[in-house]
Design a protein with these regions (language model features):
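N-terminal Rossmann-like dinucleotide-binding module
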Residues: 1-54, 75-76
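C-terminal capping/lid region of NAD(P)-dependent oxidoreductase domains
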Residues: 2, 7, 129, 156-160, ...
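Predominantly a Rossmann-like dinucleotide-binding segment in NAD(P)-dependent oxidoreductases
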Residues: 18, 137-252, 379
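Beta-loop-alpha module in the N-terminal Rossmann-like domain of NAD(P)-dependent dehydrogenases
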Residues: 55-123
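Hydrophobic residues in well-ordered beta-strands that form the structural core
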Residues: 106, 112, 131-133, 162, ...
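Rossmann-fold dehydrogenase core element
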Residues: 119-136, 156-163
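Glycine-rich phosphate/pyrophosphate-binding beta-alpha loops
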Residues: 194, 276-284
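C-terminal glycine/acidic-rich active-site capping loop/insertion
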Residues: 218-262, 266-267, 286-360, 364, ...
Length: 396
């Protein structure tokens, strides 16, 4: 990467100018990169990119055209790329970039099928090109606080992790565009749940080996007011005034994903875990409980000012706990973690620095969520989660 070697800002591409494409701007803000190109099949998105990233950037209708573009020296016009396109396109785009020798930041989830996730890892291993998956919750203050408490031994050895996810903005975020379609997201237990499944694995120190899922389309399927919103982006229709949830309008024409789902997991280190999400709650936050051999912890709130409480003496009902730790930072939820995640990506592709995120862990979050979603749609049948190829895992 010539820009890296010269010490100048990296030349960055953004592929997919949607709701998450703004994350690339963090590299610009830090001075570590400059956005020089975007690719998106939508002409409206390409026009929007000029407003978002500045006039003068190169625009392409296809990521392959961007890959083929050459600079004055005959090399690639970019040093790295952010893939923030719809989930079902991640695999094709990421594999092409990796094979072209362009380091990649892939927005989570890594892919919508296990085969695609494994193919991306294989492409990274075979090409030797650096792959990074944007599991930004590993940089959320509430998560790092809980992990620090665990690693200090305050609750002993972890034996169980429970997460309840109240997705209060679910109607606006996931049921008015492609997220609502199985063909493009697989399901929200993957699209949304991959965040927390990854964190459950991280806090527990293991990966799921057996899962059972349950859930269904319990509310949004009853709303008949539908609209093709492909001419708009989520901020244009988002409103907290859309309450109660059955008053939502202009939902996606196709809705075949679950709006409530849950999964129980047995991990390969003997930890048991569960994750539940509901997309029509009035509030929007996630609540973790981690139980160990010498106590338990629980978070109340997940942004700045929230607290994590620890119980490590025997008692009855005691809401205060034995210790309380305040969450500092993350005033806007995991968006504050985006900056730290992008900074880590830049360091990783520049000098190979160690990362908190892991492409293998991202693959295992996909594997778990895909298996759990299959379980939901097959009568809640327990399903074994395939392990990653050990050789490939050593190379990415």
């Amino acid at each position: 990467m010539s820009s890296t070697e010269a010490g100048s800002p990296l030349r960055l591409a953004v592929i997919g100018v949607g709701a998450r494409s703004y994350i690339a701007s963090h590299a610009v803000d830090s001075g570590s990169g400059t956005i020089v190109a975007v690719a998106d099949p939508s002409s409206a998105a390409r026009e929007r990119a000029a407003e978002q990233f500045g006039a003068g950037i190169a625009t392409f209708a296809s990521h392959r055209d961007l890959i083929d573009a050459r600079d004055a020296q005959g090399g690639s016009i970019v040093d790295a790329a952010f893939v923030t396109s719809p989930d079902h396109t991640h695999a094709e785009i990421a594999i092409d970039l990796l094979r072209a020798g362009i380091p990649v930041y892939v927005e989570k989830p890594l892919a919508i099928s296990l085969d695609d996730a494994d193919a991306i890892l294989a492409a990274a291993a075979e090409s030797g090109t650096r792959l990074y998956v944007g599991h930004n919750m590993r940089h959320m203050a509430v998560v790092t606080l809980m992990r620090d408490i665990i690693q200090r031994g305050e609750i002993g050895e972890v034996k169980a992790v429970w997460c309840r996810h109240f997705v209060g903005n679910g109607g606006d975020y996931y049921f008015k565009d492609w997220h609502a379609e199985r063909a493009k997201s697989n399901g929200l237990l993957l699209q949304k749940g991959a965040h927390d499944i990854d964190i459950i694995h991280w806090l527990a120190g293991g990966y799921s080996e057996l899962v059972t899922g349950m859930g269904g389309l319990s509310l949004y399927g009853d709303i008949t007011d539908r609209r093709d919103n492909s001419d708009r982006t989520m901020p244009e229709w988002f409103s907290l005034d859309a309450w109660p949830p059955l008053s939502q309008t202009e939902l996606n024409p196709v809705i075949d994903v679950e709006d409530i789902s849950m999964v129980t997991m047995r991990l390969d280190n003997g930890v048991y875990a569960s994750y539940q999400q509901c997309h029509y709650t009035p509030d929007y936050w996630r609540n973790y409980t981690v139980i160990g051999t010498e106590g338990r912890l629980e978070n109340f709130g997940d942004t700045d000012g929230a607290v994590v409480r620890v119980w490590n003496t025997r008692t009855t009902y005691d809401p205060a706990g034995d210790a309380e730790y305040r969450v500092n930072g993350d005033e806007r939820g995991h968006r504050d973690a985006d900056r730290l995640t992008v900074d880590e990506f830049i360091r990783f592709i520049t000098d190979g620095s160690e990362t908190e995120t892991s492409a293998v862990a991202a693959r295992n979050a996909v594997a778990t969520a895909v298996a759990a979603t299959e379980s939901i749609r097959d009568g809640s049948r327990p399903i074994a989660v395939p392990a990653v190829d050990e050789h490939v895992a050593t190379l990415v």
